[in-house]
A protein has these predicted regions:
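Elongated alpha-helical scaffolds
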Residues: 1-2, 157
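Phosphate/oxyanion-binding loops and surfaces in catalytic or ligand/nucleic-acid-binding neighborhoods
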Residues: 6, 32-40, 160, 164
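Active-site-adjacent loop/helix micro-motif of nuclease/hydrolase catalytic cores
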Residues: 10-14, 147-150
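Conserved kinase catalytic-core helix
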Residues: 11-78, 83-84, 90-106, 200, ...
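Aromatic-acidic/polar surface patches that form glycan- and anion
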Residues: 22, 26, 107, 111-112, ...
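Active-site acidic catalytic loop and adjacent metal/ATP-binding pocket
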Residues: 95-150
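Active-site activation/catalytic loop segments of kinase-like enzymes and analogous catalytic loops
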Residues: 135-136, 142-208
Length: 208
C-alpha cells in the first residue's frame, strides 16, 4: 500500500473532525464489510468450532484470569468495587459461561470471514478524501478467533466506543485495595455521539 501522509488513526480523526464525518466513515466501514466480506463468505455455524471456541477461548481465558498472581485475591470476593461502583465478581456470573446455553446461542450466529479485531485503533482515515467510502482502510486483521461471526467485529467496535478501550489504555495507573479497584478513566463527548450513531446503524442492520 502506498504511504499517505494524510492518513491518521480513527481515534485522532474522531477528535479533530465533526461527529457526522466520523459516523459516515464508520457506516461505510460496516456497509463494506457486510457487502464485500460477510455476505460473500456466509456459512452455517460449525459445532466443532463452537466447542473449540468454548474450550480454548472462553474457558482458557477464564482460567488465566483465575490463576493470574495479581488477580488471585480479587477472585475470592463475591463482589468487587470499580471506581466506587459495586459489581458481581466473575465467579458469581457462572450462568453466563454455561456451555449448553452458549452452544445454543452461538449456533444461531451468522458466520463468515471477518476482520477479527475491528477496534477504533485499527481503522485508518484519509484526511484528504471527502468521499467517506474512499476515506478509510483497516489494518491488523486477526484470523485466530475460531467462531468467526460478524458479531465479533461489532463487539470489538463497541469495545472501543462503549467500553472506551483507547482511553483505558492511556490510564497511567490503577490502585487495588482488597476488593476495591480505582483508576482515572476519561471519555470524550465525541465517543458518546459516535457510539449512539453506531448503535443506530447496528440496530437497523441486525433488525433489533
Amino acid at each position: 500500500m502506498t504511504y499517505s501522509g494524510s492518513a491518521v488513526g480513527l481515534f485522532r480523526y474522531i477528535h479533530s473532525n465533526p461527529p457526522g464525518k466520523s459516523a459516515a466513515i464508520l457506516r461505510s466501514v460496516l456497509r463494506a464489510l457486510d457487502e464485500q466480506l460477510y455476505r460473500p463468505t456466509a456459512r452455517p455455524a460449525d459445532p466443532e468450532k463452537i466447542e473449540e471456541y468454548l474450550n480454548k477461548k472462553m474457558d482458557a481465558n477464564l482460567e488465566k484470569i483465575r490463576d493470574a498472581r495479581i488477580l488471585k485475591e480479587l477472585w475470592n470476593y463475591d463482589r468487587i468495587w470499580i471506581n466506587g461502583r459495586s459489581y458481581r465478581n466473575l465467579k458469581e456470573l457462572g450462568c453466563l459461561f454455561d456451555h449448553n446455553a452458549l452452544r445454543t446461542l452461538f449456533a444461531a450466529d451468522p458466520v463468515a470471514d471477518i476482520h477479527g479485531d475491528l477496534t477504533v485503533e485499527n481503522i485508518i482515515c484519509r484526511t484528504d478524501v471527502e468521499n467517506p467510502d474512499k476515506a478509510w482502510y483497516i489494518i491488523d486483521p486477526n484470523t485466530g478467533n475460531l467462531h468467526d461471526s460478524p458479531y465479533l467485529d461489532y463487539g470489538k467496535l463497541l469495545q472501543s466506543l462503549h467500553g472506551g478501550y483507547e482511553f483505558m489504555m492511556m490510564t497511567p495507573r490503577c490502585t487495588v485495595q482488597e476488593n476495591h479497584i480505582d483508576f482515572q478513566l476519561t471519555r470524550s463527548a465525541a465517543y458518546d455521539t459516535l457510539f449512539e450513531a453506531v448503535c443506530d446503524d447496528l440496530r437497523a442492520r441486525c433488525g433489533a
